């Protein structure tokens, strides 16, 4: 039931932004799932929310489009998100990452621009694979490390891709490769 709720939210967000002509890219767990699905649908991991990359300048247009779709803009602990008007829950909403801005104060790299998006097989815009991997390595929380392992498990991370990562992110990838699934599942 939770998976279908997230899929409906993802589709609602993508359809509203596409219809309004707002540039965006799905990031986070749904982006990982979209890429993993291109190789092995059975290896897809569920996620509880939707993360979407937007340009800050596009936020008013995005907010209007999402409001028409039944999602209301909120700010929770400094995070911009869109929540279901009937059942607002920050844990299960659509969370915004702003393109070109640091996700956290200590982040070494800013979030990418939405121009890094490609159309997924499911029809929504998703951040390009190398950019997604860099974002996951930048964040480097436990779930991000698990997502990197998911991408490795279906051979979506190769040496050519790793070689193009910044040194600090390549070191994090090597750490995950050296200790797969130890305390991260």
Question: What residue ranges belong to the model's regions?
Answer:
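Compositionally biased terminal segments of proteins
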Residues: 1-185
